[in-house]
Amino acid sequence: MEQCVADCLNSDDCVMIVWSGEVQEDVMRGLQVAVSTYVKKLQFENLEKFVDSSAVDSQLHECSVILCGWPNSISVNILKLGLLSNLLSCLRPGGRFFGRDLITGDWDSLKKNLTLSGYINPYQLSCENHLIFSASVPSNYTQGSSVKLPWANSDVEAAWENVDNSSDANGNIINTNTLLQKSDLKTPLSVCGKEAATDSVGKKKRACKNCTCGLAEIEAAEEDKSDVPISSCGNCYLGDAFRCSTCPYRGLPPFKPGERILIPDDVLRADL
């Protein structure tokens, strides 16, 4: 075990070493002797046990330190969110996690996974021959704990009351009636001097006797237009070849659409 990790251990620590791969018995025994000189209690667990969260023993939640990557280093590609979360559940509040990986490991990705799993203060201890890192568990951490959100205690009614009182006292509210003048309150007049139609009374504007606004000319044009016969087939102006048998314009030359045509009196007389 590296000296940088041994210096972080205390005599009252309960350490769990999570090993993986094939390890010779003498190597495991040597690691046990080396770590036992620094700590109070030591136990060994295989990494495969923590892959499934249902297989994690509740009695393992007594460790203050977890060493993962000894005696064989472990790849950061294996330390995913699920595995790191299962290892976190075995640590006491304020516990520490130490890992060792090959130098080719991606520290940025591992640091992100540690943070998302619930660890704090991820730190890189060494990267000479191996990537050795550490992370901690919050001292006030308890599994399944909950905290009230800070805005849940706010008094909404009191806040609105303060807003209303402060606005009236400082005079920040503008009275919209003071922005209107007397002329704005009068009923609008039509061009010819009579009251215009409102929403409640639908009056049609008529031209005055001495109209100068042009409304009289518009009404006269509408009356002239109403006197023009309306064609039922739309082909009266084309000529007799396109007119129906009862067309009053039969016998008259073609004319422009909309042109006023005077029908002679003898045309309307019967031939008999």
Curated annotation (Swiss-Prot):
Motif interval(s): Cx2C motif 2: 244-247
Subcellular location: Cytoplasm; Mitochondrion intermembrane space
Location of region: N-terminal SAM-like domain: 1-151
Cellular compartments per GO CC: mitochondrial intermembrane space
Gene Ontology biological process terms in this record: iron-sulfur cluster assembly
Membrane-spanning intervals of the chain: none
Keywords: 2Fe-2S, 4Fe-4S, Cytoplasm, Iron, Iron-sulfur, Metal-binding, Mitochondrion
Region annotated Fe-S binding site A, chain positions: 192-213
UniProt-listed InterPro entries: Anamorsin (IPR007785), CIAPIN1 (IPR046408), SAM-dependent_MTases_sf (IPR029063)
Cross-referenced Pfam families: CIAPIN1
GO terms, molecular function: 2 iron, 2 sulfur cluster binding; 4 iron, 4 sulfur cluster binding; electron transfer activity; metal ion binding
Region (Linker): 151-185
Cited HAMAP family: Anamorsin
Subunit structure: Monomer.
Its job: Component of the cytosolic iron-sulfur (Fe-S) protein assembly (CIA) machinery. Required for the maturation of extramitochondrial Fe-S proteins. Part of an electron transfer chain functioning in an early step of cytosolic Fe-S biogenesis, facilitating the de novo assembly of a [4Fe-4S] cluster on the cytosolic Fe-S scaffold complex. Electrons are transferred from NADPH via a FAD- and FMN-containing diflavin oxidoreductase.
PANTHER family per the UniProt record, alphabetical: ANAMORSIN
Notes concerning its domains: The C-terminal domain binds 2 Fe-S clusters but is otherwise mostly in an intrinsically disordered conformation. The N-terminal domain has structural similarity with S-adenosyl-L-methionine-dependent methyltransferases, but does not bind S-adenosyl-L-methionine. It is required for correct assembly of the 2 Fe-S clusters.
Protein name stated in the entry: Anamorsin homolog
Organism: Schistosoma mansoni
